[in-house]
Amino acid sequence: GCANAYKSCNGPHTCCWGYNGYKKACICSGXNWK
């Protein structure tokens, strides 16, 4: 899940590893950041 993401989304989202391999980014499919 996105529990470790440094950003969260108020709609459908996907979590991906950050380029540094440690941080996760939460990418909103609708581009709606919370």
Swiss-Prot record:
Annotated GO MF terms: calcium channel regulator activity; toxin activity
Keyword annotations from UniProtKB, A to Z: Calcium channel impairing toxin, Disulfide bond, Ion channel impairing toxin, Knottin, Neurotoxin, Secreted, Toxin, Voltage-gated calcium channel impairing toxin
Localization of this protein: Secreted
Disulfide bonds: C2-C16, C9-C26, C15-C28
Highest taxon of source: Eukaryota
Primary localization: secreted
GO cellular component: extracellular region
Tissue/organ expression: Expressed by the venom gland.
UniProt comment concerning the protein's domains: The presence of a 'disulfide through disulfide knot' structurally defines this protein as a knottin.
Similarity annotation: Belongs to the neurotoxin 02 (plectoxin) family. 01 (Tx3) subfamily.
Function in brief: Inhibits all known high-voltage activated calcium channels (L-, P/Q- and R-type currents) (Cav), and most effectively the P/Q- (Cav2.1/CACNA1A) and R-type (Cav2.3/CACNA1E) currents. In rat brain, inhibits glutamate release, neuronal death and loss of neurotransmission in the hippocampus resulting from ischemia. In vivo, induces rapid general flaccid paralysis followed by death in 10-30 minutes at dose levels of 5 ug per mouse.
UniProt name for this protein: Omega-ctenitoxin-Pn2a
Species, as recorded: Phoneutria nigriventer
Taxonomic classification: Eukaryota, Metazoa, Ecdysozoa, Arthropoda, Chelicerata
